[in-house]
Amino acid sequence: MGKISLMLRQIVCLPIKMYQYFISPLITPCCRYYPSCSEYADSAIKHYGVIKGLLMALNRLSRCHPWSKGGYDPLFPNDKN
């Protein structure tokens, strides 16, 4: 992985980390999935890169709503809880 790619991933993940540290502790946990959507997005971007990771995160966020069943939704399908 090149330095530019690594820096880009860190820059894109910065707002996620800021949300996790500053906003998330102040609100009631409401994510219907495990791992949480912010953890999922951070991991997806770090593992798959910015473009595919963001697309995966957006897909996940679109499924996280009050009418969603939720549950265990790992980044890697073969992960066991």
Curated annotation (Swiss-Prot):
Record's GO cellular component terms: plasma membrane
Localization terms from the record: Cell inner membrane
Main function: Could be involved in insertion of integral membrane proteins into the membrane.
Protein name (Swiss-Prot/TrEMBL): Putative membrane protein insertion efficiency factor
PANTHER family, per the entry: MEMBRANE PROTEIN INSERTION EFFICIENCY FACTOR-RELATED
Keyword Membrane: yes
Organism: Legionella pneumophila subsp. pneumophila (strain Philadelphia 1 / ATCC 33152 / DSM 7513)
Membrane topology, as annotated: Peripheral membrane protein
Main location: membrane
Family per similarity comment: Belongs to the UPF0161 family.
Superkingdom of the organism of origin: Bacteria
NCBIfam families xref list: membrane protein insertion efficiency factor YidD
Keywords tagged on the record: Cell inner membrane, Cell membrane, Membrane
InterPro entries according to UniProt: Membr_insert_effic_factor_YidD
Keyword Membrane among record annotations: yes
